[in-house]
Amino acid sequence: MQELFNNLMELCKDSQRKFFYSDDVSASGRTYRIFSYNYASYSDWLLPDALECRGIMFEMDGEKPVRIASRPMEKFFNLNENPFTMNIDLNDVDYILTKEDGSLVSTYLDGDEILFKSKGSIKSEQALMANGILMNINHHRLRDRLKELAEDGFTANFEFVAPTNRIVLAYQEMKIILLNVRENETGEYISYDDIYKDATLRPYLVERYEIDSPKWIEEAKNAENIEGYVAVMKDGSHFKIKSDWYVSLHSTKSSLDNPEKLFKTIIDGASDDLKAMYADDEYSYRKIEAFETTYLKYLDRALFLVLDCHNKHCGKDRKTYAMEAQGVAKGAGMDHLFGIIMSLYQGYDSQEKVMCEIEQNFLKNYKKFIPEGY
């Protein structure tokens, strides 16, 4: 555990736009640290334990990790999105699972209470609504079983879906769908068959399909009214296949012809879908990567400038702080960041809010950043 924690802390030192952590205190008074990411490239994911920086949560005692409290799935990618999922022997696919279109929520034990966290928070709207489902008397057997699993050191990962949590697909009721169960210390997964044998977990379990056609990938891409599938390899690794129908709605295929829409797709985290769709189109693939690189370089610089300025001057009076902020933003040729630096002084309490402001300001000024040749 300590080595994993140290590697995750090291990742967060490099660039806050890539990997970061946030601390929060639960209702029981316990402190938790969640490691996650904003944007990262293939080379970033090659770093030690980077793939685990996707919502893993530690209970903390000061700066010392006490235990891994929750372990979501590691980061995995679309087929042909990057070298991780290129040249895969498809004969090694064991089975496929329906890819649900909601928000990941994962269990953790807070004292003697079983609760959900989302990818980045123990207090997000999705986590709180999922907790509400768990507390419903109709799900008391599930709640008791998940608590037993957590006490034994396992995380149950679910997809939270609801009419009010729509991404692309419309769900008619609020529910949680069990994706997998993972051992906190080792990261190993309980097999689908073993989960299916559990009469309490089975009704919540995501649907599995055996591969019965050599053209299953083509059929998956041509499917409609579904996000896609998660393919599980015989060695336990995963990759995603998304339907062209879903990608066209989520990331808007037409965004390739519109710089503003393409930047928006990147900011929304949907460029991976586009790259997978255009894996065989060299010009389009390189265009997406060029826009990605431009935005990520900007984000690195902007986030560092904003946070560094605030950290250096936050103890000063408002007038002095404003003068320093104005000088920093103007000196960097990024006057539009002045308002964000001032927002920090006024009490922005999370990097997520800062990121949102930077993203919105970038889109307002996107014409300045269109890569040469496009």
Curated annotation (Swiss-Prot):
Effect listed in the UniProt record for changing residue 272 to A: No effect on the ligation of 5'-PO4 and 3'-OH termini of the RNA strand and no effect on tRNA repair
Catalytic activity of the protein: ATP + (ribonucleotide)n-3'-hydroxyl + 5'-phospho-(ribonucleotide)m = (ribonucleotide)n+m + AMP + diphosphate
Disulfide bonds: none
Protein known as: RNA ligase 1
Keyword check for Magnesium: yes
Gene: 63
EC top class, as a word: ligase
Effect of residue 99 to N: Complete loss of ligase activity
Effect the entry attributes to changing residue 182 to A: Complete loss of ligation
Effect ascribed to mutating residue 242 to A: Complete loss of adenylyltransferase activity and ligase activity
Task performed by this protein: Involved in countering a host defense mechanism which, following viral infection, activates the host anticodon nuclease and shuts off viral translation. Repairs 5'-PO4 and 3'-OH groups in the cleaved host tRNA. The nick ligation reaction entails three nucleotidyl transfer steps. In the first step, the RNA ligase reacts with ATP in the absence of nucleic acid to form a covalent ligase-AMP intermediate and release pyrophosphate. In step 2, the ligase-AMP binds to the nicked duplex nucleic acid and transfers the adenylate to the 5'-PO4 terminus to form an adenylylated nicked intermediate.
A GO term, aspect molecular function: RNA ligase (ATP) activity
